Swiss-Prot record:
Subcellular location: Secreted
Glycan attachment sites: N11, N128, N164, N207
Enzyme type, top EC level: oxidoreductase
Species of the source: Ganoderma australe
Key words, A-Z: Copper, Disulfide bond, Glycoprotein, Lignin degradation, Metal-binding, Oxidoreductase, Secreted
Protein's UniProt name: Laccase
Temperature impact on function: Optimum temperature is 55 degrees Celsius. Thermostable. Retains over 84 percent activity when incubated for 3 hours at temperatures between 10-60 degrees Celsius.
Cofactor: binding comment: Binds 4 Cu cations per monomer.
């Protein structure tokens, strides 16, 4: 696996150096692990670094993020899915592709370098990059579309900086088949408590009436609840 990172950030309200840590890979290469000042130097602005490591025996859901101070909390984070051609659970679902990834993240209106808002909680919970803050009911929400009768493997990824989230989808159970990139015995639940850096795969059967259903990700503190669509997205048949 190779990831070339170029540091071009010139916004001095945030840290301009960076590192990248690929979370969950047992890659065994200190130089590519991305822990700033522990086993690597930060990438200086205007420079680049090639992360190069192997993970031939790992499959599942992973994430990456900055590992320099609080830069992660300002948005430098994302996900990976490594598909297993011999997935033991492949008979349990019909659909698994880039539209079946669900990311949860906390979003702060003040850059971490400028304020101390973290103790108060995030302004917004973002689901696949979209969400509302209190008093802003006009902001768009993520819509995830499904077809009635199909079974979907969703990859749920917590990119949270601080709070954990309780995740659920109105009217639907979830059959968990993977935890932190490890295939597991499937367990049916109606909600998942997911902490920073954790990943789950679950199978959702689209067996309800054609309608819209709330997807909910309630944070452990801060702007909790679902008034005006905060901490929410939409599952649409």
């Amino acid at each position: 696996f190779q990831l070339n990172v170029i540091a071009n950030n010139n916004n001095h309200t945030m840290l301009t150096q960076t590192t990248i840590h690929c979370h969950g890979f047992f890659q065994g290469t200190n130089s590519a692990d991305g822990h700033a000042f522990v086993n690597c130097c930060p990438i200086a602005s205007g420079h680049s670094f090639l992360y190069d490591f192997s993970h031939p025996d790992q499959h599942g859901t992973f994430c990456y993020h900055s590992h320099l101070s609080t830069q992660y909390c300002c948005g430098l984070r994302g996900h990976f899915v490594v598909y297993d051609p011999s997935d033991p659970h492949c008979g349990l679902y019909d659909v698994d592709h880039d539209s079946t990834v669900i990311t949860l993240s906390d979003w702060y209106h003040v850059a971490a370098k400028l304020g101390h808002s973290f103790c108060l909680g995030a302004d917004s919970t973002l689901i696949n990059g979209s969400g509302r803050s209190t008093g802003d009911c006009a902001a768009s929400l993520t819509v995830i579309s499904v077809t009635q009768g199909k079974r979907y493997r969703f990859h749920l990824v917590s990119l949270s900086c601080d709070p954990n989230h309780t995740f659920s989808i109105d009217g639907h159970d979830m059959s968990v088949i993977e935890v932190d990139s490890i295939a597991s015995q499937h367990v049916t639940v109606d909600s998942i408590q997911i902490f920073a850096g954790q990943r789950y795969s679950f199978v959702l059967t689209a067996n309800q009436s054609i309608n819209n259903y709330w997807i909910r990700a309630n944070p452990s503190f801060g702007n909790i609840g679902f008034h005006d669509g905060i901490n929410s997205a939409i599952l649409r048949y």
